[in-house]
Amino acid sequence: MVKEIHDIKHLENSSVRVDEMIKNLSGTDGEIIKENFEKYEPIEEVLSELEEKAKGYLFVVFSADWCKDCKIVVAAFAKMIKLRPAINSVFYKGIKSAPKDPDIRWRVPPSPPEVNDFDLRKIPTIYILDSNGKLIGEMIENPEHKPTLEEELVYILDKAQG
C-alpha cells in the first residue's frame, strides 16, 4: 500500500548509501555504471545550488543494474552524491518486475519491500522526501523539464519550496 508519510529512519536503515551501492556493482552492467559514473561531470554551480536547496530532504533512489536508463541516471546521481556527500540519499537496487502476474508491478523479493510503499511506476525513480517523510517531488526515468539531472532536481526542489 502506498504510504503518504514515509519513515525516514526505516528508509535509511533498510537501504544502502552511495559508497556501498558503488562497491556492490558487478558484472557487465556494473562496469557500465562505473564507467558512466567516472565520465559524468555535473555542472559545478548547479551542484552547489542543489546541495544548498537539498538541506533537510532525503533522496530515495530505486533502480536496477539491468535497466538502461538506470545505468546513466543513477551513475550521474551517484557521482553528484560523491562530490556533495551532504546531499542525504539512499539507494534501493535489484528492482524486478513481475511480468507473469498482471496484478503485481514489482516482484518482492527480489525487489525490496519498500517498492510497495511508493507509487513506483518505472525505474529509475528518485523520490524527494521532506524531514517528516512526506513526498515533495519525484524524477521518473530521465529529466523532464531540464537538460541535466542536477538542473532537474533543483527545478523539482524550487517547485516544492515555492
Where are these predicted regions, by residue range?
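Conserved redox-active cysteine motifs that mediate thiol-disulfide chemistry
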Residues: A64-V73
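Acidic, Ser/Thr-rich peripheral helices and adjacent loops at domain boundaries
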Residues: W106-L120
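Short active-site neighborhood of thiol/selenol oxidoreductases, capturing the structured segment around
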Residues: A54-D65
